[in-house]
């Protein structure tokens, strides 16, 4: 039996995103999500998470969008006080100690709402940066949580055997989940990253990935898993 986690990234980005994720959970295949702690929809996401406790919720660690929670992390921000663009972060010119403090603050904010994180992942997969491996090891040990497997680098305390990020843009196809059995060996645990949402003005303002989120939501709520695949949580 293939064990499947369908994790919706960007919980907390906007209210429309939050409602899309919840709809994808109640009426579709989404059984896990990760929350951004520095976005306009964070408080709204917290309320929804508490109302829908069958949805596993982890922390979507942020380093490339919005403003940091801490004010004393100079290597992480541009002159405007916002996080660097992802191209800058991927150059590796950031201070891992500052990343550790900022990500700890994000996790602690999540905990302050009385929520228990199922796992950690990151916006734009920045936790795959080699210079952050030690930070991840420490966070995983401190909070006793697994971390999303990265395609790019060695995995740090992974939960799944396989991670797919290709249900995205042109990869959002009607038969994606039907064909999953052809790609996965039996008994493996698989995580698929998804981004369902309803469009609202804040999403258009903050993301270049917009229309396909609605398509994702439709497919996630219309698809059925083939025999031999079961949904599990972190």
UniProtKB/Swiss-Prot annotation:
Mg(2+) binds at residues 60, 123. GO terms for molecular function: deacetylase activity; hydrolase activity, acting on carbon-nitrogen (but not peptide) bonds, in linear amides; metal ion binding. Its EC number is 3.5.1.-. It comes from the Bacteria. GO terms for biological process: polysaccharide catabolic process. Disulfide bonds: none annotated. NCBIfam families: PRK02134.1. Belongs to the YdjC deacetylase family. This is Carbohydrate deacetylase. It comes from Bacillus cereus (strain ATCC 10987 / NRS 248). The lineage of its organism: Bacteria, Bacillati, Bacillota, Bacilli, Bacillales.
């Amino acid at each position: 039996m293939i064990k499947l986690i369908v994790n919706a990234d960007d919980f907390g980005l906007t209210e429309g995103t939050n409602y899309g994720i919840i709809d994808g959970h109640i009426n579709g295949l989404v059984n896990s999500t990760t929350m951004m702690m520095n976005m306009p929809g964070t408080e709204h996401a917290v309320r929804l998470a508490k109302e829908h406790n069958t949805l596993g919720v982890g922390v979507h660690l942020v380093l490339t969008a919005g403003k940091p929670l801490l004010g004393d992390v100079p290597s992480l921000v541009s002159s405007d006080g916002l996080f660097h663009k992802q191209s800058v972060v991927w150059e590796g010119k950031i201070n891992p100690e500052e990343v550790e403090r900022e990500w700890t603050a994000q996790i602690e904010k999540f905990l302050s709402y009385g929520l228990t994180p199922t796992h950690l992942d990151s916006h734009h997969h920045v936790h795959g940066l080699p210079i952050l491996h030690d930070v991840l090891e420490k966070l995983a040990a401190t909070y006793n949580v697994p971390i999303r497997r990265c395609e790019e680098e060695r995995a740090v305390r992974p939960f799944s055997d396989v991670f797919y990020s290709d249900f995205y843009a042109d990869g959002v196809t009607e038969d994606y989940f039907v064909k999953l059995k052809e790609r996965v060996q039996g008994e493996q645990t698989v995580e698929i990253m998804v981004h369902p949402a309803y469009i609202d003005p804040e999403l258009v303002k903050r993301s270049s990935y917009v229309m396909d989120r609605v398509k994702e939501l439709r497919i996630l709520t219309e698809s059925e898993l083939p025999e031999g695949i079961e949904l599990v949580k972190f």
